[in-house]
């Protein structure tokens, strides 16, 4: 199945469908932004990022922006659910901008980008966390931006985007490193 984010029902939710576009199933339905989904290596689970406004004021702000085709990407948490949408579990709880989650090929760990350790909220680094939310580990320690991490299928390499070593302001480059456990 293919997993994706859509506004087809009025909110940014996660759906799955067969590769031919048939049998579309809505997997999330809480108010807020659910996006960036990826299947686990065995296809049994999905990792994604979500912003779930909780106060009346936050919901009104989110809804007004969404009506204009916008979102305010501020607080995003990482969630895991079963591939049928059941068992939705928040695995980060830090109020930061956590995004770009991707499964380690073992299927038990997730790598993602976050600004959780920068008081200004501007610097993003890569972090690894166990599927159950334990074992948080910081992977990169760089001023600036590290994001969009992806493992090679065999887990030997990590690829990510970064503005480290930028030749010009705002330049982002692709980096690859051997992954050593």
Predicted regions and their residues:
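Sequence signature of WD/YWTD-type beta-propeller architectures
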Residues: 1-181
